[in-house]
Design a protein with these regions (language model features):
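Intrinsically disordered or highly flexible coil/loop and linker segments, enriched in small
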Residues: 69-73, 134-145, 183, 187-188, ...
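Short, structured coil/loop segments at alpha-helix boundaries
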Residues: 103-107, 113-118, 138-139, 171, ...
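Glycine-rich ThDP/TPP pyrophosphate-binding loop and its adjacent helix/strand module
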Residues: 1-132, 309-340
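Conserved NTP-handling cores and scaffolds of large molecular machines
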Residues: 114, 140, 269-273
């Protein structure tokens, strides 16, 4: 919500609020209101219910039109009811209460009000479902495949030894790589915490905690952006940008904070290509310094890359003093399929 409001993103957040988790009622787990959360970020809150379909459709239309016209986010809360158990047979609610929800259900109401229309919709739905199931039955199964993940552990990589006689810092080499890629490809964008240099809010030079991005925010305006300290959120946004055809490079200030990014990588970025039958590409690069012996304390000095090894469709690369960082980044930018 914060990022959407801050960057004026025309997005509609649809919250289907059925008032319960698996068995825990919202009154036991939520303090305050959904509307209050939206207002805290300056986002308009709209509310409707599946109990009144006409009103729901009208509210949805208002939300869509306002988001497009004003180019701002909207939080649309749809109050609804869960008619069945959360997953299988684990519903411990009062049967009489559940029955009252069934009576309110719009589909059940339609069956009573207009049985002809109801039956027409059911018939069309059954035909569609039957058609899809038939396609699945006729398609090739995955059983004949040993794995649906490409074998890349033995991939040959063209590499060259880093010439230690070259008088250039590793960070400077990374900077040159980023600058060259941004020059040659307008789809390359940089996101991260404190990566901008001189801007309207702070005139002094900065360019990242380790000075990797330097003056890139001045050389490529609107393509280098400071973000809030919201690692999970900015990783999700970067993943979405990659799916949309951009080439985002996300900087996480310290490798220790990659624990906050893990869920977005494991459950989303690395899975999308397989989930969508190779029709989706996620050319996302996440860069982060890791390691100890710098006196930064127990939460800024860890090397946790091992926790990411073994995730399908994710390249994990560790820079070292024997390889030219520029070459590594050039190779990473050529990967247009999956995250690095």
């Amino acid at each position: 919500l914060n990022l959407a409001s801050l960057w004026k993103i025309p997005i509609i957040f649809v919250l289907e609020n059925n008032g319960i988790a698996q068995t825990t009622n919202n009154k036991q787990s939520i303090s305050g209101s959904v509307e209050g959360r939206a207002k805290a970020f300056g986002i308009r809150h709209l509310s409707s219910s599946t109990d009144n379909i006409t009103e729901l459709f009208n509210t949805c239309e208002i939300a869509i039109n306002e988001a497009r016209e004003n180019e701002e986010p909207i939080l649309l809360e749809i109050k609804t009811n869960r008619l069945k158990s959360h997953s299988k047979g684990d519903d411990n609610r009062d049967p009489n209460y559940v029955n009252s929800l069934n009576i309110l259900d719009p589909i059940n109401q339609l069956e009573k009000l207009d049985p002809v229309l109801f039956n027409t919709i059911v018939e069309k739905s059954d035909l569609l479902i039957s058609s899809v199931l038939k396609q699945v039955e006729l398609s090739e199964t995955l059983l004949k495949y040993k794995t649906i993940v490409d074998e890349r552990t033995n991939k040959n990589i063209n590499w060259k030894e880093y010439n230690s006689n070259i008088n250039i810092r590793g960070n400077d080499s990374i900077y040159e790589s980023l600058k060259n890629e941004m020059k040659s490809n307008e789809n390359v964008i940089l996101l991260g915490e404190d990566i901008e240099s001189s801007n309207d809010f702070n005139p002094g030079e900065y360019g990242g905690a380790f000075k990797v991005t330097k003056d890139l925010s001045m050389l490529f305006k609107d393509r280098v952006k400071n973000t809030p300290i919201s690692e999970q959120a900015i990783t999700g946004i970067s993943t979405g940008l990659a799916v949309a055809g951009m080439k985002p490079v996300l900087e996480i200030m310290f490798g220790d904070f990659m624990t906050l990014v893990f869920d977005q990588i494991l459950q989303h970025a690395s899975k999308f290509r397989m989930m969508f039958n190779n029709k989706v590409k996620v050319p996302l690069i996440i860069r982060s310094p890791m390691g100890g012996y710098r006196g930064y304390g127990p939460t800024h000095s860890q090397s946790i890359e091992k926790h990411f090894l073994g995730i399908p469709d994710l390249d994990v690369i560790a820079l070292n003093h024997r390889l030219d960082p520029k070459m590594i980044y050039e190779t990473a930018f050529k990967n247009n399929e999956y995250p690095t």
